[in-house]
């Protein structure tokens, strides 16, 4: 069985950042535990330019890891002068996606206009390079979809990661050719409506993720998340979709390689 964690932040695990030897030992443990749970590949998602450099330096020896390059909406103010550097870095062959980008009105409504500017620029770069975008949207789905449509984002496609929105929003995204990715939130007891939405998502547009080290699934909720826990998320999604775990693994793996135009 072959699972892919389509969104994680391996560099942000709760590990010793000051000792390089210990750092690599801890990463080895994290990845080996994931391998034991059939998680074979990982897309580690950058949240800032500084984060991208750090991640690439830290993880460059691991063939199982793919990279994205982007500036998270909450870091736009901090990296206000970095859009040109983002574009330059995005040409790197190791970068398979732009992001994560998008809008976050929950934590930073006051930077709404700046977030929108950065979001649009990510989309334009993605279209130019023919690379998908990874979208973060919190309390902002209406504006997120509006901008995607205005910027013709169907030309690059991408993922709405850690999806928690309505069925209506899901199908607006699907109509533009986007993929929908579900995280550990789908295992939470209160996620009844989200489970009902998942039932209606076409299998060919479905992806799975941990968003490690955040959003650990049940039975690990409250602990630091890690890619190994993708197996628990996959089991829950397979149950909801009424298919076998092996079938879900095959479908989501194929979807990942299709979206990012990668060879298996």
Curated annotation (Swiss-Prot):
Q: Where does a divalent metal cation 1 bind?
A: 7, 9, 100, 211
What enzyme category does the UniProt record give? Answer: hydrolase
Q: How is the cofactor bound?
A: Binds 2 divalent metal cations per subunit.
Q: Which InterPro entries match?
A: DNase_TatD-rel_CS, Metal_Hydrolase, TatD-like, TatD/YcfH-like
Q: Per its Swiss-Prot or TrEMBL entry, what cofactor is needed?
A: a divalent metal cation
Q: Where are its TM segments located? A: none
Q: Give its E.C. classification number.
A: 3.1.-.-
| Molecular function GO terms recorded | DNA nuclease activity; metal ion binding
User: What's the superkingdom here?
Assistant: Bacteria
Q: Which GO terms describe its cellular component?
A: cytosol
Coiled-coil regions, chain positions: none
Family, per the entry?
Answer: Belongs to the metallo-dependent hydrolases superfamily. TatD-type hydrolase family.
From the Swiss-Prot or TrEMBL record, give the protein name: Uncharacterized metal-dependent hydrolase BUsg_343
Organism from which the protein derives: Buchnera aphidicola subsp. Schizaphis graminum (strain Sg)
């Amino acid at each position: 069985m072959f699972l892919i964690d389509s969104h994680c932040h391996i560099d942000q695990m709760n590990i010793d950042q000051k000792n390089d030897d210990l750092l690599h030992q801890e990463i080895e443990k994290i990845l080996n535990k994931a391998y034991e749970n059939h998680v074979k590949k990982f897309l580690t998602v950058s949240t800032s330019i500084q984060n991208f450099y750090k991640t690439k330096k830290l993880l460059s020896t691991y063939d199982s890891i793919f990279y994205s390059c982007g500036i998270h909406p909450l870091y736009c103010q901090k990296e206000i002068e970095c859009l040109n550097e983002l574009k330059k870095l995005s040409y790197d062959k190791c970068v398979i996606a732009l992001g994560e980008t998008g809008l976050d009105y929950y934590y930073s409504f006051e930077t709404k206009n700046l977030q929108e500017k950065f979001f649009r620029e990510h989309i334009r770069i993605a279209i130019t390079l023919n690379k998908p975008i990874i979208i973060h949207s919190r309390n902002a789905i209406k504006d997120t979809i509006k901008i995607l449509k205005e910027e013709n984002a169907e030309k690059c496609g991408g993922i709405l990661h850690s999806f928690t929105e309505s069925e209506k929003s899901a199908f607006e995204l699907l109509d533009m050719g986007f993929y929908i990715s579900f995280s550990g939130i789908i295992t939470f007891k209160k996620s009844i409506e989200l489970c009902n939405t998942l039932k209606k998502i076409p299998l060919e547009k479905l992806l799975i993720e941990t968003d490690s080290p955040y959003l650990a699934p049940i039975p690990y909720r409250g602990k630091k998340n890690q890619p190994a826990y993708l197996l628990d998320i996959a089991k829950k999604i397979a149950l909801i979709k009424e298919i076998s775990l092996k079938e879900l693994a095959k479908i989501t793996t194929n979807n990942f390689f299709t979206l990012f135009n990668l060879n298996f």
